[in-house]
Amino acid sequence: MNVKRTKKAEKRVDTSYLSSLGIKAYGHNNLYPQEVKAIIEASPNGSTCVERRATYIEGNGIVSQVLADTVCDFFGATFDDLHHLCSEDMAYFDGFAIHINYNAFGEIVSATHIPFENCRLEEADENGYIRHVVVHPDWSGKTTRNGKAVKVNKDNCDFIDIFNPDRYVVQQQILSAGGVQFYKGQVLYITRSGKNQYCVPIADTVLTEMSGDEAVSNVLCRNVRNNFLPAGVLVTKRGQSSEDDDIGFAEDVAKLQGDMNALKILHIEVENDESKPEFLPFNSKNYDKEFTATTAKFIDNIYARFNQEQFHRLRTGAIGFSGDLANDVKLEYAEQVTRQQRMLTRAYKAVLEHWTPNTLPYNGMEDIKIEPLIKSVTNGTN
């Protein structure tokens, strides 16, 4: 079958124009990053893979410890803090955003992390040029300030210039804003699709599996927490009947549900005088084995998408438990995230090369290279 005859796949992310906000939507409801993160965080295996990916992308931090400990914004955050947050966004979204502030001379004076999910791109002009990154604290409109919801409208959005450290450009932007005190700065917005481009993170292709992973976990949890788990039923002769018998029986049954009430005995009284006390074993329906194959497939696909199959095999003992083998697996994965680390390093370089002179302990590219987790791997401590 050729391409023409195959069933066409749906577009993964809708980027239609939202005229009310002047932006390109990120997803059909403009909440694609938020929904991706929610699905990942609800999936036991998906969140494990992303957290591991973030740890390895962050590595042991940038090489220069002096620079790492230096405050880089007006909120007291250090470069190490900035690197940590950008690494986490890279793990979740394969992109990150940094807010850049300048002085009146067009020199950078601060760099602050912006949550990637808070950023949207302005619609391109007739020349295809995107001029602003649009930032809102919560595109779902649920965040409140002083007890009032922060509505999603232009008044509550910050339209911030795209990163361009050229001193002349910066000074012209400052003049247009009415002075440095009114200037909103710039945003460095980078994804694996390039600068100022929405991207589809690698997690996108296994969102179905991660959603299913959450669902199976819920079923198994309910099986343990809410299932009917008595050890058996004791049948005895009933005495004088009461109007409250039916209500009491229903309450007794409810008390036998869940793990905290497992292995108790349900007592039932019958009206037949000839009935003798009898104990009847009670076997409840267990759903654990119903999803064994499904769960295994979900896990395999999730770990494979994040290139972490060896970690899963190591965890299950499929390839043994030796310390050397574990170190080899960790070392291999540390090498796999070098592409993401280079993206971060290039971004830091673009910022630091235009920083206010003689205010940072930055001496060149070697200072901002990211140290991989090789030392931790060698010591077997990670």
Regions found by a protein language model. Give the residues of each.
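Structured, contiguous alpha/beta core segments that scaffold functional sites
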Residues: 2-48, 54-61, 65-271, 381-382
